């Protein structure tokens, strides 16, 4: 298990650097004479028409609805593996990261609502600071190399996976609108087919892919966010075949480099380009960016620490072996790295609002995530021993 985690983190570390490059490039283009080219590229109409099926969207929505569905497929595969065989497969293992994740979602949302309560438009962004970017958070931790105990890495990984599961539920419950009955019926039939394949022990990925594509189109047309199709597909792919092989893990390993080095950087490039030329101090301290930034910088670590402490004191959970509160605290700060996940929720929360709100949300996410990354990294670096453990 330790080798698998180290391989995972080494990939995430390189991916984290690529994410930073993508964000910097997006900000540069959005605030330079290339701004028109950048916006025009993302607004390029892309149409797919097969018979009566017609999907017509700008490029940025193909990225957010299509590529991110593949990312959520990967997240779903990771969640399923951890639930059945990994860090979440027993109550004892799952208790602490579960309580930590719940606190890390509730408190940031509460902080955001403190600044935005009463405004029906901005209130929609309450879930933005509740997210943790698993790739970026693990990438920052990986920069400290062998100084980080494996048990601490597993804690962050488990916490982030539960956080992702929470985000999936939030998207399904709060960011799905104008539901189409016909599309939902088709989606239900596709899900029934996927479950049937699983029950029959089918291990070939091709039929899952065909039904999965039908499911994605149906969910896209239904009003439920299309990324949820990826999670459903993942949960239906068998973890273990009769011969002991793992179709699920095989697909997970194949998707990881695509997610780390293509999907997430492309998403970051498409969504992080915030034009700041028309912003002033009053804009920067407006409720949306302040609520998000403080939710990530303060709400996340406070929520993670308080809920973890209560769970341990009530003997509902226990700290990982060899790990104390002084190591948990900087990891809690790292959970405030919302980055791509927070930006994704922002794109849903303010999809039909003035584009200014989306810009403010992305700006708050960038500020909060960068501060959380810096504080978490230097704090953890200070409390860890200088030599490998």
UniProtKB/Swiss-Prot annotation:
Cysteine pairs bridged by disulfides in the record:
none
What's the name of the protein?
Na(+)/H(+) antiporter NhaA
**GO CC, alphabetical:** plasma membrane
Task: Cite the GO molecular-function annotations of the record.
Answer: sodium:proton antiporter activity
Q: Which species does the entry assign this protein to?
A: Shewanella baltica (strain OS195)
Phylogenetic lineage: Bacteria, Pseudomonadati, Pseudomonadota, Gammaproteobacteria, Alteromonadales
Bilayer topology term: Multi-pass membrane protein
Q: Which family does it belong to?
A: Belongs to the NhaA Na(+)/H(+) (TC 2.A.33) antiporter family.
- Which Gene Ontology terms describe the biological processes this protein takes part in? regulation of pH
Q: Which domain of life is it from?
A: Bacteria
